[in-house]
């Protein structure tokens, strides 16, 4: 398969709809997330990944599952998994 697997650490925007004290707001940070997936594409704006795939029996084409599009500005690190 031509796709390479990566461990990607990224910051996920986080929201809060309730009231926060000033201290809570000051300490309010995005969540740091980790994903291990195949990189489908990567450019200056986005990295598109998928974690599972299959070949459609009717068409013979690949189909992808557990797909994500991550803005590159949110990515802290990407490391290729051997």
Regions found by a protein language model. Give the residues of each.
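Conserved RNA-binding domains used in RNP assembly and mRNA/RNA metabolism
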Residues: 2-82
């Amino acid at each position: 398969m031509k796709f390479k697997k990566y461990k990607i650490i990224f910051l996920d925007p986080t929201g809060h709809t309730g009231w926060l004290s000033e201290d809570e707001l000051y300490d309010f940070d995005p969540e740091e997330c980790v994903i291990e997936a195949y990189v489908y594409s990567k450019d200056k704006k986005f990295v598109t990944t998928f974690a599972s795939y299959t070949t459609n029996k009717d068409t013979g084409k690949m189909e992808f599952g557990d797909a994500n599009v991550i803005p590159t500005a949110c990515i802290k690190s990407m490391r290729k998994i051997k």
